[in-house]
Amino acid sequence: MATKFPKFSQGLAQDPTTRRIWFGIATAHDFESHDGITEESLYQKIFASHFGQLAIIFLWTSGNLFHVAWQGNFEQWTKDPLHVRPIAHAIWDPHFGQPAVEAFTRGGASNPVNIAYSGVYQWWYTIGLRTNNDLYTGALFLLIVSAVALFAGWLHLQPKFQPSLSWFKNAESRLNHHLSGLFGVSSLAWTGHLVHVAIPESRGQHVGWDNFLSVLPHPQGLGPFFTGSWGVYAQNPDSTSHLFNTSEGAGTAILTFLGGFHPQTQSLWLTDIAHHHLAIAVLFIIAGHMYRTNFGIGHSMKEILDSHVPPAGGLGAGHKGLYDTVNNSLHFQLGLALASLGVVTSLVAQHMYSLPPYAFLAQDFTTQAALYTHHQYIAGFIMTGAFAHGAIFFVRDYDPELNKDNVLARMLEHKEAIISHLSWASLFLGFHTLGLYVHNDVMQAFGTPEKQILIEPVFAQWIQSAHGKALYGFDVLLSSANSPASSASQSIWLPGWLDAINNNTNSLFLTIGPGDFLVHHAIALGLHTTTLILVKGALDARGSKLMPDKKDFGYAFPCDGPGRGGTCDISAWDAFYLAVFWMLNTIGWVTFYWHWKHLTLWQGNVAQFNESSTYLMGWLRDYLWLNSSQLINGYNPFGMNSLSVWAWMFLFGHLVWATGFMFLISWRGYWQELIETLAWAHERTPLANLVRWKDKPVALSIVQARLVGLAHFSVGYVLTYAAFLIASTSGKFG
């Protein structure tokens, strides 16, 4: 008899119902639960799968390069980045009639194409790529790297090349190699690329495989480096009249600290970026020599953690026991990694628009909007994942004996205080913010807008002033010419920075008022409530007063039967599931705020945001409704336009989103009855009844149906907003 899917679980493979398929898919990546798994083979499988992940990433990025080189207009775009629309790839669609062909033939192409809103054109241009040939070379190189990664994954599954468990648990070696090798050396290599290729190209000096060994990145070569006169490398930077990609106004400096933006490209100075990466490289290469391995010198992580005991004893055993807890729990490590990565991804979203690193990105409004929204949503999913794996750690890996009275144990012991404080903060934020919004709505509705409660964000304005924003008239720190902070840096980076922060053409420290104050607190409500649900889920994952033995039921369970009322919806998984809805809504508010504020800035009518953002009807009417008009007009009696694809996606996104509720609101019995009726009809329908099934059809479990509902809700939500964002921005600005 052929072995049925799933091979990793004999119990499931013998299940006579369709549960076999769905549970098989659901647990395919839960290696810990598979038959015959050992700790060592678990680590080895995960390690090998990382190479597969890398292979996919390199294949994907190779595809981006290849399609732009083949079907894009990169060379034309580099000659006039502000007026040529970058093409992502061609569209071949047999459904296209003549009006569709005409609508999508743009960007100088002779056939229908998609416009690129990913920022890759700006990135490739900034780092020194100039021709289609450069793109093809990059695509081929990444294809080779992808093949190497795939081979490495296969190789590390072979018995002779499988690392041992002790190798995976050698924390010091891993820290050293990741800090020095991964971050340090790669930052150094990137500095090298910027200095040797990107900066010369930005000054009109071609550097390629043919001449990179003979072109000096600096007129004095390595002389100043070896003689210690490093300041030479910062002398003679590009002038403010420099034209990117030409020698006009170009300097010779390679490592600078100018501050602010290149006036023409509105992006950070390339020489500042190179300097930053060099500094990062030095720091991380040093950091990667700190931990004790072969030579008996340096820090031991275990010793560091064990000695972290607060002296007075009031805080218990401190970090004792944490080394083994972290080092023996993959879920703990993954939780930490996801928490860090989530924060970093959100920071990328913030910095990509406020300090644009790529030439001419700041003038491509749709791309800026797309990149901000993309990175914020991804950050949300990653951050919720951190708490999910934190909760799984508490259920599967936490050892109370090993962590007696340390910080982890103490967190669990005073969880009621933590959860109730978070709850109070969420309630306070929610009621006060909603109260202000609704009051303002009523005042607008009754025709007395002057009776709105409008609060100036004075503390935030003070912080902006401290960073040098002069508009508010606070005479403090960098906004005061006489402060030590100002005088200390006057000749170095400050002139460029002060010019940038007080210039209204960029998004650095935007002017804020009462509308910003309100939406800031609405976002704070969302963040605190999402955190409350996630933290409660993790802290109650092992047990609660209501259900002390919760950990014995695992991470995800629907209920403990009818005998124990109130045990439904309280698994750690349920907390994660609820939190994702809050996360999505919160990031909805974040992206609405960012987008509307920027639309009004870019259009020069910032008064619209300032006046309409202080009450809810303003958001609904002047942001959502007003900006969806282009979408609703994608198809009309006069034919179609290039926004029609977004109009269709907007409708389809709503459909996917609404489908989610079908799974979220109806429970298992309804589906079971429906399936049995459909199966009955199938068996009695001629022709159809020639097709039989081996597995008895049964409804999804409660937990699975929730997952399917959540997946539809999330995908539909993001898809709908993506269509709205891109259509409403590109409809205005091209």
From Swiss-Prot:
The PsaA/B heterodimer binds the P700 chlorophyll special pair and subsequent electron acceptors. PSI consists of a core antenna complex that captures photons, and an electron transfer chain that converts photonic excitation into a charge separation. The eukaryotic PSI reaction center is composed of at least 11 subunits. P700 is a chlorophyll a/chlorophyll a' dimer, A0 is one or more chlorophyll a, A1 is one or both phylloquinones and FX is a shared 4Fe-4S iron-sulfur center. Belongs to the PsaA/PsaB family. The lineage of its organism: Eukaryota, Viridiplantae, Streptophyta, Chlorokybophyceae, Chlorokybales. Signal peptide: none annotated. It is found in: Plastid, Chloroplast thylakoid membrane. [4Fe-4S] cluster binds at C559, C568. It is a multi-pass membrane protein. One of its GO terms (molecular function) is oxidoreductase activity. One of its GO terms (cellular component) is photosystem I. Chlorophyll a B1 binds at H654. Chlorophyll a B3 binds at M662, Y670. Phylloquinone binds at W671. One of its GO terms (biological process) is photosynthesis. InterPro entries: PSI_PsaA/B, PSI_PsaA/B_CS, PSI_PsaA/B_sf, PSI_PsaB. Its EC number is 1.97.1.12. This is Photosystem I P700 chlorophyll a apoprotein A2. It is an enzyme of class 1 (oxidoreductase).
